[in-house]
């Protein structure tokens, strides 16, 4: 049998050209930390859910929040934010458990649009609630008749939820734009 084996006749790699050494091929990092399906992405989703649910519970625990439209808007926005974050946290847990990448173009588009919408709604609701809270506390001086501490706490928690949602949106949007 005349079969040639690599161990018998070793073949050397040709030397690299000068252009390949100067310009190495671009490597794309598909699973950067903070993206969907990573541990940091899961942590961001968890904190989004935690702070949005806390803002929702604190605001809903007051008896007079339905009388102000901005506070109703905050309850609706944080409710949507908490549901969205919880659903995507479950998707992240699944992806981490089965070691699956969530870098599908359609999924990233859905995540980017959903994160953009929910974070914008949460930010707008927190800003509106902050304006009403300042009006009640500073301008009208009627905190004795209202639940100002709960309003301020809920507004602060909504802002913190938005701060946790913003990196998720930026990572997804960056991943979508870099394709």
UniProtKB/Swiss-Prot annotation:
<dbReference type="Pfam" id="PF04535">
    <property type="entry name" value="CASP_dom"/>
</dbReference>
<keyword id="KW-0472">Membrane</keyword>
<dbReference type="InterPro" id="IPR045009">
    <property type="entry name" value="CASPL-5"/>
</dbReference>
<keyword id="KW-0812">Transmembrane</keyword>
<protein>
    <recommendedName>
        <fullName>CASP-like protein 5A2</fullName>
    </recommendedName>
</protein>
<feature type="transmembrane region" description="Helical">
    <location>
        <begin position="156"/>
        <end position="176"/>
    </location>
</feature>
<feature type="region of interest" description="Disordered">
    <location>
        <begin position="1"/>
        <end position="24"/>
    </location>
</feature>
<dbReference type="InterPro" id="IPR006702">
    <property type="entry name" value="CASP_dom"/>
</dbReference>
<feature type="topological domain" description="Cytoplasmic">
    <location>
        <begin position="177"/>
        <end position="179"/>
    </location>
</feature>
<keyword id="KW-1003">Cell membrane</keyword>
<feature type="topological domain" description="Cytoplasmic">
    <location>
        <begin position="92"/>
        <end position="115"/>
    </location>
</feature>
<feature type="topological domain" description="Extracellular">
    <location>
        <begin position="137"/>
        <end position="155"/>
    </location>
</feature>
<keyword id="KW-1133">Transmembrane helix</keyword>
<feature type="topological domain" description="Cytoplasmic">
    <location>
        <begin position="1"/>
        <end position="38"/>
    </location>
</feature>
<comment type="subunit">
    <text>Homodimer and heterodimers.</text>
</comment>
<feature type="transmembrane region" description="Helical">
    <location>
        <begin position="116"/>
        <end position="136"/>
    </location>
</feature>
<feature type="transmembrane region" description="Helical">
    <location>
        <begin position="71"/>
        <end position="91"/>
    </location>
</feature>
<comment type="similarity">
    <text>Belongs to the Casparian strip membrane proteins (CASP) family.</text>
</comment>
<dbReference type="GO" id="GO:0005886">
    <property type="term" value="C:plasma membrane"/>
</dbReference>
<feature type="topological domain" description="Extracellular">
    <location>
        <begin position="60"/>
        <end position="70"/>
    </location>
</feature>
<feature type="transmembrane region" description="Helical">
    <location>
        <begin position="39"/>
        <end position="59"/>
    </location>
</feature>
